[in-house]
Amino acid sequence: MSTPEVTPTLSDSNGNEAGVQTQFTIQEISDLLPHRYPFALVDRIIDFQPGKCAVGLKNVTINEPFFPGHIPDRPIMPGVLIVESMAQVGGVILTQLPGMRGKFFAFAGIDGVRFRRPVVPGDQLIMTVELQSFKLQRIAKMQGEARVDGQLVCGGEMLFSLID
């Protein structure tokens, strides 16, 4: 009877364990979240630390379905959709927690959300979301912010609840 080999855990330059997925394509996001066009508001996850945080991006184009009505002759991304974009990044974090794959989390509240500048066609929205707490395997609190060209666009706290 032989003793099983123990392989040391390898880490990447960010301290993530080898084999841990740190980026997600739009198809992989679609496999995790139920949102579809026109409400799929995250194009990629560019950094992911399991159980901690994620950074997602949304390329904002003139072809977005909300621009014709918001606002004619001066297209601006609605603030609620910026918050929804951050929430979808948070959804990726939650669906990657142990036992949460395939579960659906909905907004339970938002606090302290502030909008600092408009998001317009051609902008690349970078959303950073951090998991602050996850209680009773049902309620999550997250802090999120969205930036364009390094400038803060929006930030605030989001609460999520597991929907059975």
From Swiss-Prot:
InterPro entries, alphabetized = FabA_FabZ, FabZ, HotDog_dom_sf
User: One matching Pfam family, short form?
Assistant: FabA
Q: Which reaction does it catalyse?
A: a (3R)-hydroxyacyl-[ACP] = a (2E)-enoyl-[ACP] + H2O
Q: Where in the cell is it found?
A: Cytoplasm
Give the active-site positions.
Answer: 70
Q: GO molecular function of the protein, one example?
A: (3R)-hydroxyacyl-[acyl-carrier-protein] dehydratase activity
Q: Which SUPFAM superfamilies does the protein's record reference?
A: Thioesterase/thiol ester dehydrase-isomerase (SSF54637)
The portions of this protein that span the membrane are none
* UniProt GO cellular component terms: cytoplasm; membrane
| Enzyme Commission designation | 4.2.1.59
The record ties this protein, via HAMAP family, to: FabZ (MF_00406)
Which family does the similarity line name? Belongs to the thioester dehydratase family. FabZ subfamily.
Q: Could you tell me what this protein does? A: Involved in unsaturated fatty acids biosynthesis. Catalyzes the dehydration of short chain beta-hydroxyacyl-ACPs and long chain saturated and unsaturated beta-hydroxyacyl-ACPs.
- Provide the protein name: 3-hydroxyacyl-[acyl-carrier-protein] dehydratase FabZ
